[in-house]
């Protein structure tokens, strides 16, 4: 019972995004916090033994389903003892404890955007002055998520942009039925990663979830703009590749290359010249130059090293009743 994470008498009914009904720990139990301290300290010792610093610790915290803890008598008693009025106040309390644990150990706390957002996608002001670094992943326009990064940055929260629509590298390259990868966040190829604009995020996706073209000139209409102060809170970019559907390292290489070149390009040059111009020709010229670098230099280099990568299949187009290759 020293590291027990769940209340066996909890009758809460919920379903997570992954269709789990029991994947949330009970934050009202002292054993939960003993477990967390144990994990943090054990990982810290691994770094210490290796002679390197543990600079940051990612606490996760995303996609916590509605309905958790509602059937836990332990949680209800805990709320009364600590003056908490809403179930979601437990989440704030939990995060406070983790932040304190990490701060005492001089470790930067990192988490997904969900931990500092309210269920209605508004900013949770409770953590405005916290030191947590927030990874913004759920930025799908159709779900209203594309405004979240700038909401947080403008409110003073430091963020890392890891947009699912641009930087989730386990997404399929295209919508073809035989193309491996997930599709819930759209498709991601080497051009979608290249298109990411940290300081003009609404222009980062040129197609919607259905694969239909997006007018980038009007994509930001009515959306939260990034302020001058908010710009200072964008601390970096991150690409993710989730492995639950990947069965070999060769597959990992397939998803990484050539997608990752766009991530590297944008991390190196966060505000390319074409982003500041309304002339689409400038963008197309930059895209052609980028593609030429991949085809003429990067892919041959990977091939020499025996690294697996994806080559786009031949393309066709129907124009004026003719099939052109």
Task: Indicate where each model-derived feature is located.
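Glycine-rich beta-strand-to-loop/alpha-helix junction loops that act as flexible
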Residues: 60-63
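Short, active-site-adjacent cap segments at secondary-structure transitions
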Residues: 65-67, 118
């Amino acid at each position: 019972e020293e590291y027990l994470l769940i209340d066996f008498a909890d009758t809460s009914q919920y379903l997570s995004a992954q269709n789990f009904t029991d994947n949330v720990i009970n934050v009202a139990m002292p054993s939960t916090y003993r477990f967390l301290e144990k994990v943090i300290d054990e990982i810290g010792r691994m770094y210490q033994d290796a002679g390197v610093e543990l600079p940051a610790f990612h606490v996760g915290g995303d996609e916590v389903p509605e309905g958790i803890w509602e059937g836990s008598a332990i949680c209800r008693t805990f709320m009364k003892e600590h003056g908490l009025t809403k179930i979601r106040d437990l989440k704030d309390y939990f995060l406070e404890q983790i932040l304190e644990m990490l701060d005492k150990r001089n470790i930067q706390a990192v988490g997904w955007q969900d931990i500092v957002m309210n269920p209605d996608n508004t900013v949770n002001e409770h953590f405005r002055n916290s030191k947590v670094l927030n990874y913004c992943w759920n930025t799908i326009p159709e779900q209203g998520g594309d405004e979240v990064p700038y909401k947080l940055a403008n409110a003073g929260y430091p963020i890392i942009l890891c947009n699912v629509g641009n930087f989730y590298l386990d997404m399929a390259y295209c919508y073809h039925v035989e193309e491996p990868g997930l599709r819930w966040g759209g498709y991601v190829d080497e051009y979608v990663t290249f298109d990411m604009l940290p300081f003009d995020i609404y222009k980062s996706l040129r197609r919607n979830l259905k694969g239909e073209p997006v007018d980038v000139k009007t994509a930001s209409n009515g959306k939260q703009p990034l302020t001058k102060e908010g710009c200072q809170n964008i601390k970096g970019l991150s690409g993710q590749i989730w492995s639950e559907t990947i069965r070999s390292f060769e597959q990992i290489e397939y998803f990484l290359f050539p997608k990752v070149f766009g991530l590297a390009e944008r991390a190196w040059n966060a505000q390319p010249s074409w982003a500041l111009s309304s002339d689409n020709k400038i963008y197309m010229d930059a895209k052609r130059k980028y593609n030429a670098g991949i085809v003429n230099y990067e892919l041959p280099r990977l091939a020499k090293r025996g690294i697996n990568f994806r080559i786009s299949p031949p393309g066709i187009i129907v124009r004026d009743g003719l099939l052109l290759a």
